[in-house]
Amino acid sequence: MPFTLGQRWISDTESELGLGTVVAMDARTVTLLFPSTGENRLYARSDSPVTRVMFNPGDTITSHEGWQLHIDEVKEENGLLAYVGTRLDTEETNVTLREVLLDSKLVFSKPQDRLFAGQIDRMDRFALRYRARKFQSEQYRMPYSGLRGQRTNLIPHQLNIAHDVGRRHAPRVLLADEVGLGKTIEAGMILHQQLLSGAAERVLIIVPETLQHQWLVEMLRRFNLRFALFDDERYTEAQHDAYNPFETEQLVICSLDFARRNKQRLEHLCDAEWDLLVVDEAHHLVWSIDAPSREYMAIEQLAERVPGVLLLTATPEQLGMESHFARLRLLDPNRFHDFAQFVEEQKNYRPVADAVAMLLAGNKLSNDELNRLGDLIGEQDIEPLLQAANSDRDDAQAARQELVSMLMDRHGTSRVLFRNTRNGVKGFPKRELHTVKLPLPTQYQTAIKVSGIMGARKSAEDRARDMLYPEQIYQEFEGDTGTWWNFDPRVEWLMGYLTSHRSQKVLVICAKATTALQLEQVLREREGIRAAVFHEGMSIIERDRAAAWFAEEDTGAQVLLCSEIGSEGRNFQFASNLVMFDLPFNPDLLEQRIGRLDRIGQAHDIQIHVPYLEKTAQSVLVRWYHEGLDAFEHTCPTGRAIYDSAYASLINYLGAPEETDGFDDLITSCREQHEALKAQLEQGRDRLLEIHSNGGEKAQQLAQSIEEQDDDTSLIAFAMNLFDIIGINQDDRGDNLIVLTPSDHMLVPDFPGLPEDGCTITFERDVALSREDAQFITWEHPLIRNGLDLILSGDTGSSTISLLKNKALPVGTLLVELIYVVEAQAPKQLQLNRFLPPTPVRMLLDKNGNNLAAQVEFETFNRQLSAVNRHTGSKLVNAVQQDVHAILQLGETQIEKSARALIDNARREADEKLSGELSRLEALRAVNPNIRDDELAAIDSNRQQVLESLNQASWRLDALRLIVVTHQ
């Protein structure tokens, strides 16, 4: 290589050193000083891994003093270059900048600069970069973006609610599905969409204290959302880091009690500028016109300050009209300000909902019903539609659907309230109860008697709670020497049941963690039964491992022993046998236990086994739950109300189970109350609201589209390629499971989302649902999104050289493959990616400027190419640099037309979509007051900003590949 003192070169292998200067040389070696780091490097002259830095007319360069020069001419004298051009800060022309005075911190970021500086990437990295651009652009455009990445079954009614609400500006809604229909999942899906699209960045979830960990686990396991749990200790710690402790985290969960207990803390919560507030169990917020509770007022304060609010609550019928109004008032106090007016309004909607139910059932409507429908949709001439809907014509069904859609838009609370019932959603299993009456051991009888004498001063409730768990009473007296499991007949029954059903998975739930641990030891030691344990003393990872062991079909645990609290938020649909070793204190907890198996997606009928001891509180509760509430074999929406009204009597019977006088009457009375309340709830069902909430055919199609996306194998191939290039080890474990671990040669030392000890992944939704220790990989998973960011935000794969062996073309023929990106810069919350995500435009140019991209498909072409090592590549580039420059110029002139077409299409689509949505809502505002003024204003403002940002969209060269034809 011809070296001269003062020349500027760049290292091919250590580009981070910046620009080097030749400071010494002899016959065999050359020394380069790299001023930006102060380091020297000694190279062999004959084969040094360095590239001569030469700029061309049109480039802009920086001097060591910081000023910039636009090059007009390049002169060479005695092997040294001088650049002549216009100085940009002073606009002085004909300024000369010698290469020795160039800025040494020079970083080549443009693909063409990297190519000419010898910074040549591997060919597979270029291919990955282009695929990443292509896939990312396609994913942004998907209409159901944000709904595919969660570890859940694809249940239409959940997807419908999440799809509707998740795309709104600052949604304020009430999610009031019946128990078991997945309100938590719906809320998680909405959060996931809002966070992914940038519509929200800061989220606060407020839940009852007992549900904090359940939410933490659900958000992490199902949606890959890492929330921080704030309690007194965490709050105090965070005070050292910030004036407002809640500003130290973006995603926060805390309990309602924690939020309202301290005035300053509540002020900090209100001042923390959340985008979304989620409140679970909102029906426990007590409100009346004269005396709202402190809890209600705390949430009211927050709801006034936070733009988006999701309230998760029991069904409106269970709540009662006043309580239901109180929730709606939190969402929109301007709209729901007068309770009497609200009651009147609701009455007007019932006949309409009934008429629609008849319409959908295919029944003919009376003239009165037709008139009512006509009155409600008064501003349009719908007479022809009504006649078609009420006829036997072929278009009758379509007319009915259109009528229902129009009514839904105008229906009183359908924009703010979503409510699905088990009657309206199919797919639930049957529940079959098997009770096993067992004798009360004498050891327990003695312990109970002594306890009764010693605990005479205890409250009725405490006595009742004690009586539910005789093993605890016995253990208290006997201490560590007490071995209740040696004589308790429930243990013998359980072992017998498990040994006779060895091939079946069984979930055993008991109230206390100690009971679960003792049972595990007995089952293991006596019968060799493989049992996993699951209790609140375990970490989330330990619980995951236990759940995964239970889920394994052949080598896994037969039994999972859960404590009451430990099982919260976990579902085990792959099992259908439930054993309740004891019974919980109230119907809500009973439903929660059965709900671990009774979910949508359960393939078998659920067998509920209740071994109970006679003459104990358990025998009282079994009868009351089953005969009084029918709570074992059916969900019991009336349970809480009847429990509250029968509480005093029930407590007495539980505390003294042998005194049964009047108990039959209590059961009869509770059963009658249950039937009456149930009939009342059924009568109060709002059919129109249910139709709106479950989404009908539209929701089915949405689920089907996502299922088809699940079957697309392109993600698997791309992800494996991505992990290879990042440097992540992959170990295929079979059963559609792969273990990822960090390697020593990764592109970055700590890859975000990959734990130090690695993780197990799967691309199969079914596997992810049964294996909670495996992460479900989709385009929306952080590992994929972080991988895309890592590749696309840097210069990985942005310049490369390949050889094309093709005897039909002359040797030395040049082709340049250019990947341009058309994009618009805007704040994330504008969600510009819906209309113009960063979109790749591929061009394949010969030296005459002919674009062959349409005739030569990327993947086919890529397979025909072979790689060139960096050193040979640098020599090739130097030889054809002028030709490549000329082709680049041709590319710049051709890209404008394609880019402009993309931008114009995006503008047109954005204008049509956003203007259409605005017009629709403005028209409906006249007949449906639930459309908020601030929502309309936000859509209008969003439209203007989106169009303005699209006006300023631009394009840039993102990657290029130089291709040289060879015959060898």
UniProtKB/Swiss-Prot annotation:
InterPro entries documented for this protein: Helicase_ATP-bd (IPR014001), Helicase_C-like (IPR001650), Helicase_RapA (IPR023949), P-loop_NTPase (IPR027417), RapA_C (IPR022737), SNF2-like_sf (IPR038718), SNF2/RAD54-like_C (IPR049730), SNF2_N (IPR000330)
HAMAP family in alphabetical order: Helicase_RapA (MF_01821)
Family designation: Belongs to the SNF2/RAD54 helicase family. RapA subfamily.
Pfam families tied to this protein: Helicase_C (PF00271), RapA_C (PF12137), SNF2-rel_dom (PF00176), Tudor_1_RapA (PF18339), Tudor_RapA (PF18337)
Residues binding ATP, per UniProt: 177-184
Keyword Lipid metabolism recorded: no
Keywords from the UniProt entry: Activator, ATP-binding, DNA-binding, Helicase, Hydrolase, Nucleotide-binding, Transcription, Transcription regulation
Helicase ATP-binding domain segment(s): 164-334
Protein name, as recorded: RNA polymerase-associated protein RapA
Functional description taken from the UniProt entry: Transcription regulator that activates transcription by stimulating RNA polymerase (RNAP) recycling in case of stress conditions such as supercoiled DNA or high salt concentrations. Probably acts by releasing the RNAP, when it is trapped or immobilized on tightly supercoiled DNA. Does not activate transcription on linear DNA. Probably not involved in DNA repair.
Subunit description: Interacts with the RNAP. Has a higher affinity for the core RNAP than for the holoenzyme. Its ATPase activity is stimulated by binding to RNAP.
SMART domains: DEXDc (SM00487), HELICc (SM00490)
Gene3D superfamilies with a match to the protein in the record: 2.30.30.140, 2.30.30.930, 3.30.360.80, 6.10.140.1500, 6.10.140.2230, P-loop containing nucleotide triphosphate hydrolases, Tandem AAA-ATPase domain
GO MF term set: ATP binding; DNA binding; helicase activity; hydrolase activity, acting on acid anhydrides
CDD domains noted in UniProt: DEXDc_RapA, SF2_C_SNF
Domain Helicase C-terminal residue range list: 490-644
Enzyme's top EC category: hydrolase
E.C. number: 3.6.4.-
Residue ranges of the motif DEAH box: 280-283
Annotated GO biological process: regulation of DNA-templated transcription
